[in-house]
């Protein structure tokens, strides 16, 4: 649970810090794919107005279908964001065998 709080704090910090750069409006997507039941797998989206949306993903496993299903959901979501006039400006990720974190930062065009 502490990990979720830290993640939300970081998303909030990135969104607030990035929003102070001139007239740029940022949208941040945090993808968490975890194998443990306590955290779960999900995408959290925070737009330039602070509006939050969460999209559930399948729990991380070694099954190819899980990776495929999650990748399709992530890809469709990123495409929808692009269709709304946002451009991807940064991506980072990390993790271990139990959890994968990926952050996408978009700027509104």
What does each model-found stretch correspond to?
Residues 1-2, 85:
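Solvent-exposed, well-ordered amphipathic alpha-helical segments
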Residues 2-12:
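Bacterial N-terminal signal peptides
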Residues 10-109:
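Terminus-proximal functional modules
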